[in-house]
Amino acid sequence: MDLSSRLSSGSSRIPKRHRDYRDEEPRRERGSGGIGREDPRGHYGSERPRRRRRDESDFRRHRESRERSYREDERPRRERRYDDYEPRSLRYSSVGRSRSPPPSRERSVRSIEQELEQLRDVTPINQWKRKRSLWDIKPPGYELVTADQAKMSGVFPLPGAPRAAVTDPEKLLEFARSAEGSIIAPPPPLQPGASRQARRLVVTGIPNEFVEDAFVSFIEDLFISTTYHKPETKHFSSVNVCKEENFAILEVATPEDATFLWGLQSESYSNDVFLKFQRIQNYIVPQITPEVSQKRSDDYAKNDVLDSKDKIYISNLPLNLGEDQVVELLKPFGDLLSFQLIKNIADGSSKGFCFCEFKNPSDAEVAISGLDGKDTYGNKLHAQFACVGLNQAMIDKSNGMAILTELAKASSQSIPTRVLQLHNLITGDEIMDVQEYEDIYESVKTQFSNYGPLIDIKIPRSIGTRNSGLGTGKVFVRYSDIRSAEVAMEEMKGCKFNDRTIVIAFYGEDCYKANAW
């Protein structure tokens, strides 16, 4: 038989495929069960039997799975186990664990109570003590001043540029509140007592057994015991002590507070210990802005005696003189703008000194000349200006650009001292490393010793100090004479250290000794 006839006869005997594969096997056996009849497909490797067997196997698996699902549907549903809520990694972990019954309600409540008990001593997040940071903290007096207006003050020059002037933030008030200044930013209120020099005093006669808490109470009592004090007002700010020379740098809240203590001259601190109050070096006289002047009343009794270059201090007044009698002494010299006689709040007796200000500034010098040394009821009066130091010139606000020009031309009146302060030389992170701190110290010492003999160098660090962060990033150098400090300032202007242009300025020696940065 030829090949074509075999294929035709064999194919005619192949049973037709049925939709239901369960009947496939019997039909195939009946069609191929004859004697001498062979399935011609077996000789030529047909894939149909293999495919059929694979389909039957898949069907059996499908049928068994379906029957299983039927049986599971008839089975009663089990309760959800407690560990079904556990993460998948725990439920299917290879680590064996013992099956335990689901916890009871009492057990859950008890465990929650134990957890709450452990949290009783935890400090609430709103009471956490945050680490002191100087980021986004503006200098005193500049809290409501924009960066553009602060730059115009001349206090913050660009690195390498000479400092335009020693000035207070109130110097900006005329420009900031003018029409020209409002173009840059809305006019913010400036604090007249921003200068730290105006709020600091040198307190001499500090005892060796100095206790800060007792000193703070003593200072506050000096205010509270007099009519100068206003209710619910705190006056003390900070103190830095130089025990080697028995003095301290006291900082109070306002310039008027500092002038009040200065007017006391000296006070008994303890047995045979008297403290004296003096102005610091480079004291800056505060200004009274035109806006503040316009708000003052024509009645001198309603105005506070603000610190200014025209404020007068009169001491050694007879203790039996009242306010009206002292005012009568002052009226011949001009109309008063403000007046305050300091009295004891306990009995109303006079402390023997007063502050005043005339409406016409020229009357102040006339009054001082007429009152100083005058005999009054057996006492020789002493009259002088209360605020004597570096004065700041008021700037005309007629033209905005003219104001900027005047600020740029303003010359520094800083008094030369033996101490130089260096800005932009180091960062706080650099001096945290001990080795790097020593390297910077030696580098500064080597460079600045070229201009004269050095006494010492101070690089403030915030490690373990009470005033954390104050002075960090600055370097202070003290020479044996003022001339060497002046030469060093001229020679080192604009120099760079570690690719940073340093800025140099004089610093008060009294604050340097007391570490009052």
Curated annotation (Swiss-Prot):
Any GO molecular function: pre-mRNA 3'-splice site binding
Region (Disordered): 1-112
PROSITE patterns: RRM
Biological process according to GO: mRNA cis splicing, via spliceosome; spliceosomal complex assembly
GO cellular component, one term: commitment complex
Bias-annotated ranges (Basic and acidic residues): 20-89
Keyword Flavoprotein attributed: no
Domain RRM: 310-388, 418-509
Keywords: mRNA processing, mRNA splicing, Nucleus, Repeat, RNA-binding
Subcellular localization, as worded in the UniProt entry: Nucleus
Segments of skewed composition (Low complexity): 1-13
SUPFAM superfamilies in alphabetical order: RNA-binding domain, RBD (SSF54928)
NCBIfam families cross-referenced by the UniProt entry: U2AF_lg (TIGR01642)
Task of the protein: Necessary for the splicing of pre-mRNA. The SF1-U2AF59-U2AF23 complex has a role in the recognition of the branch site (5'-UACUAAC-3'), the pyrimidine tract and the 3'-splice site at the 3'-end of introns.
The family this protein is said to belong to: Belongs to the splicing factor SR family.
Assembly with partners or alone: Forms a heterodimer with the U2AF small subunit. Can also form a homodimer. U2AF large subunit (U2AF59), U2AF small subunit (U2AF23) and SF1 (bpb1) interact to form a complex required for complex A formation. Interacts with wat1/pop3.
The protein's name in its UniProt record: Splicing factor U2AF 59 kDa subunit
